[in-house]
Amino acid sequence: MELSSVSSFSLGTNPFISIPHNNNNNLKVSSYCCKSKSRVINSTNSKHCSPNNNNNNNTSNKTTHLLGLYGQSRCLLKPLSIFSCKDQRGNSIRASAQIEDRPPESGNLSALTNVKDFVSVCWEYVRPYTAKGVIICSSCLFGRELLENPNLFSWPLIFRALLGMLAILGSCFYTAGINQIFDMDIDRINKPDLPLVSGRISVESAWLLTLSPAIIGFILILKLNSGPLLTSLYCLAILSGTIYSVPPFRWKKNPITAFLCILMIHAGLNFSVYYASRAALGLAFVWSPSFSFITAFITFMTLTLASSKDLSDINGDRKFGVETFATKLGAKNITLLGTGLLLLNYVAAISTAIIWPKAFKSNIMLLSHAILAFSLFFQARELDRTNYTPEACKSFYEFIWILFSAEYVVYLFI
């Protein structure tokens, strides 16, 4: 018998398939391809099948049957289900073994994980790069006074210094938090991954994380008997952070007033830590050459920080009418301007070491500022290669903060 059939069917339709009417004939089907329900399966088989004792050219009658879903399941799904069930059974056994081998998670471990996640989100909320800069700044200013007066060291003094640094961090956390609360619409465009706009913390939690550090810092200032000057400087830092972000002031909307706010915050931080350090050691306030240098350097460096902070925020600032140096001049021009100002600052530091070799340790001044200047140059060139993408601009601004911290480390040894 000669059987020639062309079958086209899928698991999602009712196919026509040609089969012989005589069930006594031995049929050999060459191949068929069974894939997913969304694909049409075509199989073309052409074979010559003859009985052993019959060599005539007569062919059997061919009957076309309509096979429905039940017929399909018998023809196609049953062979597949054998292998599928076998695989599923093997997978189930392996999965069960893995579950049995896995140690049960204790309640203490789960609670510890939740606490770690919460602390991580809070740390991200307060802008880690600014917090690190404040910690290094405070530590180095106080450490320099201890290096010059090692005989005045005492552990109670270190404890008071740590409490004072916590108070300063309170104002820092407030400034970072209040800015995020009132910039939510802008940050949805500029920084959608921030904890507040991404929904990882609620607005209520954000207010708690913003106001609590400011209040705790103020209480610490009072408990340390810091005096009216340091208390006023702390309040000035809180006021500067408020008028920078909160309507109707929003000094951040103007590049000049924004720079003034940032200058007040950094100058106040620099002066207050130095003044408090000498007062705690029982020393009178003096404008030493090293402190005069770091004050002048950080003041000019604030220009670079103020101009570079909005490089990654151009799109959102333009949409909401916030005028910055970056929106006015563009990311490339601001980068060139800020880099140029900071490079001039480094040149001035090197020149200072050459002109007044007795007032400073010239070798350290020359080498350290040369290294920092070259690192700034290469970082600016790398930013230019990326065509000033928001991510690259953000990294560049954070690198400026690294240079900010590095300058205080240099201050320890000059």
Curated annotation (Swiss-Prot):
N-terminal signal peptide: none
Record pathway: Secondary metabolite biosynthesis
Protein name: 2-acylphloroglucinol 4-prenyltransferase
Tissue expression pattern: Expressed in trichomes.
Quaternary structure and interacting proteins, as annotated: Component an active demethylxanthohumol (DMX) biosynthetic metabolon in glandular trichomes (lupulin glands) that encompasses a chalcone synthase (CHS) and a membrane-bound prenyltransferase. Interacts with PT2, forming a functional metabolon. Interacts with CHIL2; this interaction promotes catalytic activity.
Transmembrane segments: 153-173, 201-221, 229-249, 256-276, 281-301, 336-356, 359-379, 394-414
Activity control note: Stimulated by CHIL2 but inhibited by CHIL1.
Transit sequence range: 1-86
Source organism, top-level taxon: Eukaryota
InterPro entries, per the entry: AtHST-like (IPR044502), UbiA_prenyltransferase (IPR000537), UbiA_sf (IPR044878)
Keywords: Chloroplast, Membrane, Plastid, Transferase, Transit peptide, Transmembrane, Transmembrane helix
Cofactor needs: Mg(2+)
Entry EC no(s): 2.5.1.136
Cellular component, GO, one term: chloroplast membrane
Any Pfam family hit: UbiA
Bilayer topology: Multi-pass membrane protein
Subcellular compartments: Plastid; Plastid, Chloroplast membrane
Family from the record: Belongs to the UbiA prenyltransferase family.
Effect of D183A: Loss of catalytic activity
This protein's record includes keyword Membrane: yes
GO molecular function: prenyltransferase activity
Family matches, as PANTHER family: HOMOGENTISATE SOLANESYLTRANSFERASE, CHLOROPLASTIC
